[in-house]
Amino acid sequence: MLGALQLGVLAACVVVLVPMGMAGWHLSRNKMLFFSGALFITLAVGVHLTPYFPSVTDFVSTVSSVVVIDNRRTCISLLHDVVWDVTKSPGFSTLNNNSVNYDKSWGWTSSSRVSACEFQKLSRSDASDLLNGSWVVVAGDSQARFIALSLLSLLLDSKDMESIRGDLFKRHSDYQIVVDEIGMRLDFIWAPYTSNLTDLTMGFKRNRNYPDVLVMGSGLWHMLHFTNASDYGVSLQLLRDSVVSLLPISPERGTDGPVAGSVPVRSPHVFWIGMPTLINSMLNTEAKRERMTDAMRGAYDRQLQKSKILRQSGGPLLMLDIESLSWNCGVRCTVDGMHYDVPVYEAAVQIMLNALLIESHQKL
Ligand SMILES: *[C@@H]1O[C@H](CO)[C@@H](O)[C@H](O)[C@H]1NC(C)=O
Ligand SMILES: *[C@@H]1O[C@H](CO)[C@@H](O)[C@H](O)[C@H]1NC(C)=O
Ligand SMILES: *[C@@H]1O[C@H](CO)[C@@H](O)[C@H](O)[C@H]1NC(C)=O
Ligand SMILES: *[C@@H]1O[C@H](CO)[C@@H](O)[C@H](O)[C@H]1NC(C)=O
C-alpha cells in the first residue's frame, strides 16, 4: 500500500508541477500543444491507474484540480495590480505641461501574491513566439484601435510601424496585416457599437472560421449617440449569447459540451476592452461633456456587470480593465479625457498576453 501511495503522490506532483512549472516559460502554439498533450497523457495514465489504488484517487483529483485551477484563477484576478510612475519629462514647463511632457512607466506591484504569479512584460521575441501562427482579431472603437496599435508595436520595429500607424488610423475603417516572420494575421475591425460586434461573431460562426484570439469592446459611441444604458445592456446580452454560442465549451452548457479530456477542442480566447476613465471636464465637445457624465458612465458599467458577459460575472470574456489602468495612470496620461497615452494600452496588451500564457499552460 505504501507503494501505491507513493505512486499517487508522484502522479499528483506531475499533474500539479508540469503546468505550474511552465508558468515562467514562453510557449509557441506548437509547444503549447505538445505540453497539453503531455499533460493529457499524464492525466490519462493517472486516471487509469488510480482505480487500482482507491485511497489515492481523491487525493490526486483534489490536489490537481484545486491547486492548478485556484492558482490560475488567482493570478488572472491579480493581473491588473499595476503601479504607475509618472514624472515630469525634461521638456516640461508650467506652460508646456501636456500629457506628452510626462514620462510614464508601469510595473506589477511587488506584493508577494502578485510576485508569486511571475507576470512578465513580454519582449518582442516572447510575444512572437506566443502568437506564432495565430489569427488575432481586434474589434471595436478607438480604444480597440489603440490596443491593435500597441500589439503591433510590440511585434514590429518602429520603421514598419510608421506606415502601419497611418493606415490603421484612417478614420473608421478596417485594417488587416499579416506579419510574415511569425505567420500571424491581425485584423482590426471598426465596430463602434455592440451590435457590430454581434454581427462579427455571428459571421465567424456562419463561416466556421474562428480567430485564436478575439479582443473587443464598445460603449463610448453608444453613450454619446444613444445615451441609454438599458439599451446598451440589451445589446450586451445579445452579444453574450452570440459569443457563448461560438465557444465549444460555454460556461452555461458545461456538461452538454464536449467532455473534458476527450478530443481537444480549440476555443478562441476572448477579451473585453473596458471603457476608459472619462474625465468630463477634459472631453473635447459640448455633446460629450453633456452626455458622457460620471452618472451615465456608472449606469453603463452596471449594465456591463448585469449582462454577465464578463468572466468575473460568469460569462465568457476576460476583461481588460482600461478604466482601472487609465485611472491609476491619471490625468497626466490623457489630453482629451477619453483617449489615453500609449503606455496605458501597452499595459493592457501585456496583461492580455500574460493571461494567454496562464491559460494556455494550465488549461487541463
Ligand atoms: C499647466 O499649464 C497651465 C497653462 O498652460 C497652467 O495654468 C498650470 O498651472 C500648469 N500646471 C502645472 C502643474 O504646472
Ligand atoms: C514560427 O513557427 C515556425 C514553424 O513552427 C518556425 O519555423 C518559426 O521559426 C517560428 N517563428 C518565430 C518567430 O518563432
Ligand atoms: C454598426 O451598427 C450600426 C447600427 O446597428 C450600423 O448603422 C452601422 O452601419 C454598423 N457599422 C459597421 C461598421 O458595421
Ligand atoms: C432606452 O432603451 C430601451 C430599450 O431599448 C427603450 O425601451 C427605451 O424606450 C429607451 N429610452 C429612451 C429614453 O430612449
Annotated model-derived regions:
Residues M1-L364:
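A compositional signature for long Ser/Thr(±Pro)-rich, low-complexity
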